[in-house]
């Protein structure tokens, strides 16, 4: 199941920022739009799509991952095909809304929820592995899209992406996914099956409304939002921040490689830790890693320290996703995990959408991007303190 979920996660690539970025200049030239107009259309589409995440999550809970992912895959293929027809900024915003809603949002959610249902004791490591495989695969997507654009043009490239989704994500979802282990007479983690005359163990299943009244949900939301806000801002303005210490655009772009390595290491390590007793301290640790990243971003000048900053930023991003994915079902069960994940996803996307603007304003207020990074480090430090004080609201794992 981890392999299938990872594959579907990779197939969301054309709807992720890393995939859309390949089309940016071609959209600008082909539609005669400025970079600002394209960025605004992307922001509007992303923000509007985020508001649907809780509803999508509830529907996933109602119909199951298999059916939901199949529908989302087919709809995603259609929206990608629609991108080949766009004309003008408004139409482009509508297209961005569709691919962000279905690719970055819905399909990504079902791929994560599917793993949550199939693992309990080893859920953290399984989610960390899924994230690692997905990130590795998505990193290839821009290369393939760029080759398609060079060969056929950007409009045909959208159609090619739609075709790939239609012949892969849809059949994988329908024929590969199984909603729950019990549907095959199995149990999470591959444990022994339950005899017919024995009741299935009942795990706590908390509704979305109950979760929203939990302090743990809002602490985890604060960690997720802070990670999304500042992580996105640092990534978006990487050339600006590193340019202040003399790095060229090419040199700054090269630092994405240690960030990718850090994200893989962070996802696997924190996913493994999430299955152990230390997991109730992980939200605070994630916030501390982000604070350390921002302090390094404001002080690093030599190549070793810039390399350390880049790797630490990747660790912050990878660890945040692994901790969020593993703690949600540990806190609230899996009965309503789709709607709860959708609500947390809404918070994360909204924060992410404001990341670039926050650092732009910060550079004006504080005089530079490096200074802004230093001052903004105060917030994750406060979030880390809050998460440490209220760590008792997070479940311990006494088995390891």
Which ranges hold each PLM region?
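Helix-loop-helix hairpin linking two adjacent transmembrane segments in secondary transporters
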Residues: 133-181
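Extracytoplasmic
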Residues: 1-35, 53-56, 142, 234-239
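Hydrophobic core of transmembrane alpha-helices in multi-pass small-molecule transporters
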Residues: 10, 90-106, 225, 305-319
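Structural signature of the two symmetry-related core transmembrane helices
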Residues: 67-81, 281-295
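Helix-to-loop junctions at the C-terminal end of transmembrane segments
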Residues: 51-65, 266-278, 364
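Intracellular juxtamembrane helix-capping segments at the cytosolic ends
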Residues: 106-119, 319-332
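Extracytoplasmic gate region of multi-pass secondary transporters
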Residues: 16, 20-24, 209-267
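A late C-terminal transmembrane helix in Major Facilitator Superfamily
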Residues: 129, 138, 331-366
């Amino acid at each position: 199941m981890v392999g299938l979920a990872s594959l579907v996660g990779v197939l969301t690539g054309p709807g992720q920022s890393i995939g859309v970025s390949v089309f940016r200049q071609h959209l600008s030239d082909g539609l005669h739009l400025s970079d600002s107009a394209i960025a605004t259309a992307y922001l509007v589409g992303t923000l509007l799509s985020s508001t649907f995440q809780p509803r999508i999550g509830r529907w996933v809970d109602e119909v199951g991952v298999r059916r939901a992912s199949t529908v989302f895959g087919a709809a995603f293929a259609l929206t990608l095909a629609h991108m080949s027809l766009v004309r003008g900024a408004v139409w482009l915003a509508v297209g961005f809304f569709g691919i962000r809603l279905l690719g970055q949002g819905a399909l990504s959610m079902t791929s994560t929820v599917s793993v949550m249902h199939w693992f309990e004791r080893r859920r953290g490591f399984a989610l960390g592995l899924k994230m690692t495989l997905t990130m590795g695969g998505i990193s290839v997507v821009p290369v393939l899209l760029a080759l398609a654009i060079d060969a056929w043009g950007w409009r045909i490239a959208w159609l090619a992406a739609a075709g790939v989704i239609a012949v892969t994500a849809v059949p994988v979802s329908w024929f590969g996914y199984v909603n729950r282990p019990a549907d095959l007479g199995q149990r999470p983690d591959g444990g022994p099956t339950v005899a017919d005359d024995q009741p299935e163990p009942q795990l706590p299943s908390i509704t979305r409304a109950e979760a929203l009244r939990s302090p743990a949900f809002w602490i985890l939301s604060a960690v997720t939002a802070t990670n999304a806000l500042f992580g996105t801002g640092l990534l978006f303005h990487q050339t600006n921040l590193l340019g202040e210490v003399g790095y060229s655009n090419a040199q700054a772009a090269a630092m994405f490689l240690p960030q990718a390595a850090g994200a893989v290491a962070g996802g696997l390590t924190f996913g493994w830790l999430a299955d152990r007793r230390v997991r109730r301290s992980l939200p605070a640790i994630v916030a501390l890693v982000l604070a350390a990243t921002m302090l390094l971003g404001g002080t690093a000048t030599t190549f070793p320290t810039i390399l350390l900053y880049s790797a630490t930023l990747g660790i912050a991003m990878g660890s945040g996703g692994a901790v969020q994915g593993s703690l949600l079902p540990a806190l609230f069960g899996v009965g309503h995990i789709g709607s709860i994940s959708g609500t947390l996803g809404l918070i994360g996307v909204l924060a992410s959408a404001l990341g670039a603007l926050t650092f732009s304003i910060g550079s004006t207020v504080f005089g530079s991007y490096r200074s802004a990074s230093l001052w903004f480090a105060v917030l994750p430090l406060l979030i880390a303190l809050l998460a440490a004080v209220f760590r008792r609201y997070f479940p311990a794992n006494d088995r390891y």
